[in-house]
Amino acid sequence: MKMKKTLCRVLCAVCALAMVLPVIFSVTASAASTKYIQSYYYPTKTLIGEELPYNQLSDQNGNPAQIEIGENQYTLITYWASWCPDCEEELSHLPELLPVLDEYENVQWYLVNRTDGVDDTIATASAYLKEQGITLPSLYDEGLAFRNALGINSIPTTILLNPEGEVELINPNVITTPGQLRAMLDYAINGADSATLSYVQANLLNESGSVKRAAGSTTTSSAAQGLLAQYAVDSLNKSLLDTQRQWVFANGSTGNLGDDLALLGALSSWRGYEGDAATLGETIVNTYFADGQLNGQVSLSDLDLESMMLLGRGAPYDEALSVIQKGFIGAQFPLYYSEYNADKGTYNHQVIDTADALTTVYHLAQVGKVRKQTINWLYDQVEGDGLRARYTTDGEVVATYNYETPALYALTALIALEAGEEDLFTQSVMLMETCRTFDTASASNGSFTTRNKDSAFDQCAALLVYAKMQQE
């Protein structure tokens, strides 16, 4: 999230990582973590889509109390301390922020104080709120059990719950403007995909149904188009899918096997479009699978196994699966080679494009064939120094591609969903959203900043993640 981080947050992060300055931020061994998300100030023990792991607090009289959620009510919870400059800054903006709540039918906002008994007590925190004229419902985390259970690493941290009490969004930054708060509430209430879709439709989607690689670009991205079609199906957006159906009717093929298979999968999933899917399927078989087998140079990421199943005997599913599985690089770097020469039976051992490799893993995960070694490697990267755009086949980062993109984390999140890895999913979404603009006052609201030249791929990959999230 693109929001302000100041000295208080840096101090808190240093304390949590190095376990120094214990008076400022008491960190137990179980709460301390070296997870990469912590460098972005995210909690380390709170899962998206799950209920709060702990809800035992105290009221201003020291009596047991809980965060209470009414029917159809969304709940903001801000974890804070009276000595924290960033908390003071956020709370000073409440006069501008609170009117935003009135724009929505049923939203409440709790403050939960970090009551360690040293830097803050119920008495000092209550006195601070009274002095500042803050009347939001306030509870107190005596002994820091709430903080430790959620793995909160810095303050303020704001968590947004849906009416079922499940975590929708975590904002570990200082909220200072109505646009930032409104973007958070829109994310939860209107859907995580809402603002991103609006950005894509306004800036990237052509009337024909094709997708621009970037705002203002004249070059299109069939890869993004395939993802967008899949998103349309999963989000039940018929009008958006219709644009893809019309494009296929007018153009026949993207000219790329993987993207054609993605469109086939989308059209096949929608009742009434079976004829369109059959026509596209015939085109795919005739274009790419002469004699019922793979031919020429094949990108492993194009072998969408789930969609190939739809083609029956016309597609060499077994051969494709075998080619992918034999393209496994090895235990030390458990991803897959990028290309296979079907005529020579050899793999290209050159640099690995991580987005392509993760797309291959996603296709394996969709048919239940993902390796545990690969999942473990993804955990290591997501919890370590993050994923990078390209690697050598020895697993070394290519110097000129030593950067992250939101699509890498979107693809990892999709893999995690298919594999049932909730923690990997949460961390991947958090890292993906460090690149997202949360501000309704910005023309870029909902979009993802990326160094990928195909910016649309990042936007549409995130959309697909959001659609899958809503299905869970």
At which residue positions do the language-model features occur?
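N-proximal helix/coil linker or "cap" segments that precede and/or mark the start of modular domains
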Residues: 28-53, 123-127
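Terminal, non-catalytic domain-edge segments
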Residues: 192-195, 314, 357, 363-369, ...
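Thiol/disulfide oxidoreductase modules built on the thioredoxin-like
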Residues: 131-134, 142-185
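Structural microenvironment flanking redox-active thiols in thiol-disulfide oxidoreductases
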Residues: 88-131, 142-148
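Extended ligand-binding clefts on enzyme/binding-domain cores
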Residues: 192-198, 219-222, 257-261, 269, ...
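N-terminal carbohydrate-binding/catalytic regions of secreted carbohydrate-active enzymes
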Residues: 193-263, 368, 378, 408, ...
